Design a protein with these regions (language model features):
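Acidic/His- and Gly-rich active-site-bordering loop/insert found
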Residues: 4-98, 103, 107-127
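Histidine/acidic-residue-rich, glycine-tolerant segments that coordinate divalent metal ions
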Residues: 56, 76-78, 84-97, 103-104, ...
Length: 219
């Protein structure tokens, strides 16, 4: 193992109790999208990035490269689960829970930031690491607003990870999510008496849906 990797791993091991505490607490809190108030407090005392109460950005270092590490920590409704169980066992009937390990995703991102911070401190190399708290991921919410406000423009790279059934490095990019709201308007008319005067908003919705389906195949 290289010295650089060892520096980072030693720092992570030193803080492992804190990292595990964060993972366990986020699991227990199981807060829904954009309601992760206690979960966000585990990371940072100052939230409110981009006007989102449970989003945050915490940086260390100076100069380039500037690496962003993305943490997520929201839960899903109806997925309450006792920890340490291999079968579904609700902790709270009908309660919230983590469907794909976002408690680990957030804690693992924190561990990565701790490792990079330690490397920057001990080597004196130029560079900046920023840990971004990205709430509401299950609904595709916060990152869209963070992109809108230009939060990523300062970065040379943004990295994240996700719990899986194997360990691997995925070098490809992720698809962007842009939220858009469309409103369709029609013109009311009697279907039998004067159908030619009507304009169906539903027809427009169906045509757009078909067009998007064909477009997606070629993107």
């Amino acid at each position: 193992m290289t010295l650089n990797k060892q520096l980072a791993l030693d720092a992570i091991e030193k803080e492992q109790n804190t990292i595990l505490h964060v993972a366990d607490e986020i699991w227990d809190y199981a807060e829904l999208s954009l309601q992760e108030f206690r979960s966000a407090k585990l990371y940072c005392e100052e939230e409110g990035v981009c006007g989102i109460a449970t989003a945050f950005a915490a940086s260390f270092g100076s100069g380039r490269p500037h690496i962003g590490i993305l943490a997520e920590y929201d839960a899903l409704s109806g997925l309450s689960q006792q920890g340490g169980q291999l079968v579904h066992a609700e902790r709270t009937p009908g309660g919230t829970g983590h469907g794909c390990g976002h408690n680990l995703l957030g804690a693992g991102a924190l561990a990565a930031a701790i490792g990079v911070k330690a490397w920057l401190e001990q080597t004196g190399c130029p560079g900046t690491v920023t840990l971004y708290g990205c709430p509401g991921e299950e609904g595709g919410a916060a990152k869209a607003f963070m992109a809108r406000d230009g939060l990523w423009k300062q970065l040379d790279a943004a990295l994240t990870w996700h719990p899986e059934d194997c360990n691997e490095v995925i070098t490809g990019g992720s698809n962007a999510c842009i939220q858009v709201q469309y409103t369709f308007h029609g013109v009311a008319s009697h279907a039998a008496g004067a159908p030619e005067l009507g304009r169906s908003a539903l027809d427009a919705v169906e045509l757009m849906n078909i067009g998007v389906q064909f477009l997606r195949e070629h993107m």
